Amino acid sequence: TGVPDLPVPEQILSYLETYRRLLEGVCISGGEPLLEPGLADLCGAIRNLGLEVKVDTNGSLPGALEVLVRRGVVNYVAVDIKGPPGKISALTGARLPEEALVLAVEKTVNLLRKAGIPHELRTTVVPGLIEPEDLLLMAQWLQDGSRFVLQQFRPDRTLDPSLRQVRPHPPEVLRQLARDLSGFFSECSVRGAG
Protein backbone atom coordinates (compact mmCIF):
# COMPACT_ATOMS: atom_id res chain seq x y z
CA THR A 1 0.00 0.00 0.00
CA GLY A 2 3.01 2.29 0.29
CA VAL A 3 2.18 3.14 3.91
CA PRO A 4 4.82 1.89 6.34
CA ASP A 5 3.72 -0.29 9.23
CA LEU A 6 3.85 1.72 12.43
CA PRO A 7 4.77 0.18 15.75
CA VAL A 8 1.69 -0.48 17.84
CA PRO A 9 2.38 2.32 20.40
CA GLU A 10 2.59 4.88 17.59
CA GLN A 11 -0.72 3.67 16.16
CA ILE A 12 -2.33 3.89 19.57
CA LEU A 13 -1.02 7.39 20.20
CA SER A 14 -2.06 8.56 16.74
CA TYR A 15 -5.60 7.31 17.33
CA LEU A 16 -5.75 8.90 20.78
CA GLU A 17 -4.41 12.19 19.42
CA THR A 18 -7.20 12.21 16.83
CA TYR A 19 -9.98 11.50 19.33
CA ARG A 20 -8.62 12.92 22.59
CA ARG A 21 -11.26 15.65 22.78
CA LEU A 22 -13.88 12.91 22.98
CA LEU A 23 -12.03 10.83 25.57
CA GLU A 24 -11.36 11.16 29.26
CA GLY A 25 -8.98 8.27 29.64
CA VAL A 26 -7.60 4.96 28.50
CA CYS A 27 -7.79 1.54 30.14
CA ILE A 28 -4.82 -0.71 29.47
CA SER A 29 -5.74 -4.33 29.97
CA GLY A 30 -4.56 -7.72 28.81
CA GLY A 31 -3.46 -10.51 29.36
CA GLU A 32 -1.08 -8.89 31.77
CA PRO A 33 -0.09 -5.43 30.50
CA LEU A 34 2.72 -5.08 33.05
CA LEU A 35 4.66 -7.69 31.06
CA GLU A 36 5.17 -5.11 28.29
CA PRO A 37 8.58 -3.44 28.68
CA GLY A 38 7.45 -0.17 27.04
CA LEU A 39 4.31 0.26 29.13
CA ALA A 40 5.62 3.11 31.29
CA ASP A 41 6.61 5.11 28.21
CA LEU A 42 3.24 4.47 26.58
CA CYS A 43 1.39 5.51 29.74
CA GLY A 44 3.53 8.65 29.94
CA ALA A 45 2.74 9.54 26.34
CA ILE A 46 -0.97 9.01 26.98
CA ARG A 47 -0.81 11.24 30.06
CA ASN A 48 0.99 13.88 27.96
CA LEU A 49 -2.10 13.94 25.74
CA GLY A 50 -4.08 15.01 28.80
CA LEU A 51 -5.79 11.65 29.26
CA GLU A 52 -6.17 9.57 32.41
CA VAL A 53 -4.63 6.07 32.49
CA LYS A 54 -6.15 3.01 34.16
CA VAL A 55 -4.22 -0.26 34.26
CA ASP A 56 -5.75 -3.68 34.88
CA THR A 57 -3.34 -6.19 36.44
CA ASN A 58 -3.37 -9.53 38.20
CA GLY A 59 -0.97 -8.16 40.83
CA SER A 60 1.87 -10.55 40.03
CA LEU A 61 4.37 -7.87 38.95
CA PRO A 62 4.65 -5.25 41.70
CA GLY A 63 8.06 -4.10 40.45
CA ALA A 64 6.67 -3.17 37.04
CA LEU A 65 3.72 -1.40 38.67
CA GLU A 66 6.10 0.50 40.93
CA VAL A 67 7.77 1.99 37.83
CA LEU A 68 4.40 3.37 36.68
CA VAL A 69 3.65 4.74 40.14
CA ARG A 70 7.11 6.29 40.55
CA ARG A 71 6.86 7.98 37.14
CA GLY A 72 3.35 9.25 37.91
CA VAL A 73 1.83 7.83 34.74
CA VAL A 74 -1.09 5.86 36.17
CA ASN A 75 -4.28 7.31 37.67
CA TYR A 76 -6.18 4.18 38.63
CA VAL A 77 -5.37 0.48 38.99
CA ALA A 78 -7.72 -2.50 39.06
CA VAL A 79 -6.18 -5.61 40.59
CA ASP A 80 -7.81 -8.90 39.65
CA ILE A 81 -7.59 -11.12 42.70
CA LYS A 82 -7.94 -14.62 41.29
CA GLY A 83 -8.53 -16.38 44.60
CA PRO A 84 -7.48 -16.67 48.24
CA PRO A 85 -4.01 -17.76 49.33
CA GLY A 86 -3.71 -21.46 48.68
CA LYS A 87 -5.82 -21.41 45.51
CA ILE A 88 -4.26 -18.77 43.25
CA SER A 89 -1.83 -21.08 41.42
CA ALA A 90 -4.47 -23.75 40.91
CA LEU A 91 -7.03 -21.24 39.60
CA THR A 92 -4.63 -19.49 37.24
CA GLY A 93 -2.30 -22.28 36.15
CA ALA A 94 0.58 -19.94 37.02
CA ARG A 95 4.08 -21.35 37.01
CA LEU A 96 5.15 -19.35 40.05
CA PRO A 97 4.92 -20.99 43.46
CA GLU A 98 1.80 -20.08 45.44
CA GLU A 99 3.84 -18.26 48.08
CA ALA A 100 5.46 -16.04 45.44
CA LEU A 101 2.07 -15.15 43.94
CA VAL A 102 0.61 -14.31 47.35
CA LEU A 103 3.60 -12.13 48.20
CA ALA A 104 3.43 -10.36 44.83
CA VAL A 105 -0.26 -9.54 45.27
CA GLU A 106 0.40 -8.26 48.80
CA LYS A 107 3.24 -6.05 47.54
CA THR A 108 1.03 -4.72 44.74
CA VAL A 109 -1.83 -3.83 47.08
CA ASN A 110 0.50 -2.29 49.67
CA LEU A 111 2.24 -0.24 46.98
CA LEU A 112 -1.07 1.21 45.80
CA ARG A 113 -2.22 1.98 49.33
CA LYS A 114 1.08 3.59 50.35
CA ALA A 115 1.29 5.67 47.16
CA GLY A 116 -2.34 6.77 47.48
CA ILE A 117 -3.17 5.56 43.98
CA PRO A 118 -6.93 5.12 43.56
CA HIS A 119 -7.56 1.44 43.03
CA GLU A 120 -9.95 -1.45 43.31
CA LEU A 121 -9.50 -5.09 44.08
CA ARG A 122 -11.89 -7.28 42.15
CA THR A 123 -12.82 -10.91 41.84
CA THR A 124 -14.98 -12.67 39.30
CA VAL A 125 -17.24 -14.98 41.29
CA VAL A 126 -17.31 -18.23 39.32
CA PRO A 127 -19.60 -20.80 40.98
CA GLY A 128 -17.63 -23.93 41.77
CA LEU A 129 -14.29 -22.11 41.65
CA ILE A 130 -14.80 -19.16 44.00
CA GLU A 131 -17.06 -20.02 46.91
CA PRO A 132 -18.36 -17.71 49.66
CA GLU A 133 -15.75 -19.05 52.08
CA ASP A 134 -13.04 -18.16 49.53
CA LEU A 135 -14.34 -14.60 49.41
CA LEU A 136 -14.21 -14.40 53.20
CA LEU A 137 -10.59 -15.62 53.16
CA MET A 138 -9.76 -13.03 50.50
CA ALA A 139 -11.42 -10.29 52.54
CA GLN A 140 -9.51 -11.27 55.66
CA TRP A 141 -6.27 -11.37 53.66
CA LEU A 142 -6.65 -8.04 51.83
CA GLN A 143 -8.85 -5.98 54.15
CA ASP A 144 -8.31 -2.36 55.04
CA GLY A 145 -8.77 0.67 52.90
CA SER A 146 -9.40 -0.70 49.43
CA ARG A 147 -12.49 -0.92 47.30
CA PHE A 148 -13.49 -4.55 46.65
CA VAL A 149 -15.69 -5.45 43.68
CA LEU A 150 -17.45 -8.76 43.16
CA GLN A 151 -17.87 -9.28 39.43
CA GLN A 152 -20.64 -11.41 38.01
CA PHE A 153 -19.38 -14.42 36.07
CA ARG A 154 -20.45 -14.37 32.41
CA PRO A 155 -20.32 -17.87 30.86
CA ASP A 156 -20.69 -16.37 27.38
CA ARG A 157 -17.42 -14.46 27.86
CA THR A 158 -15.16 -17.20 29.19
CA LEU A 159 -12.12 -18.52 27.38
CA ASP A 160 -12.48 -21.89 29.10
CA PRO A 161 -15.06 -24.04 27.25
CA SER A 162 -15.63 -26.15 30.39
CA LEU A 163 -17.08 -23.07 32.13
CA ARG A 164 -19.64 -22.21 29.46
CA GLN A 165 -22.27 -24.40 31.14
CA VAL A 166 -21.74 -22.89 34.62
CA ARG A 167 -24.74 -20.91 35.80
CA PRO A 168 -23.84 -17.58 37.42
CA HIS A 169 -25.08 -16.75 40.89
CA PRO A 170 -28.35 -14.81 40.99
CA PRO A 171 -27.72 -11.08 41.46
CA GLU A 172 -29.17 -11.12 44.99
CA VAL A 173 -26.61 -13.73 46.08
CA LEU A 174 -23.77 -11.44 44.96
CA ARG A 175 -25.36 -8.43 46.62
CA GLN A 176 -25.65 -10.38 49.89
CA LEU A 177 -22.02 -11.49 49.62
CA ALA A 178 -21.01 -7.84 49.14
CA ARG A 179 -22.97 -6.88 52.26
CA ASP A 180 -21.30 -9.72 54.19
CA LEU A 181 -17.83 -8.49 53.17
CA SER A 182 -18.48 -4.76 53.50
CA GLY A 183 -16.88 -4.51 56.94
CA PHE A 184 -13.49 -5.52 55.55
CA PHE A 185 -13.14 -2.76 52.94
CA SER A 186 -13.79 0.94 52.45
CA GLU A 187 -16.40 -0.12 49.90
CA CYS A 188 -17.68 -3.46 48.64
CA SER A 189 -19.88 -3.58 45.56
CA VAL A 190 -21.16 -5.79 42.76
CA ARG A 191 -20.55 -5.29 39.05
CA GLY A 192 -22.40 -6.87 36.13
CA ALA A 193 -25.22 -8.52 38.07
CA GLY A 194 -28.14 -6.63 36.61
Describe each PLM feature range:
Residues 1-11:
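Canonical Radical SAM [4Fe-4S] cluster-binding loop centered on the CxxxCxxC motif
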Residues 173-194:
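A C-terminal junction/extension of Radical SAM enzymes
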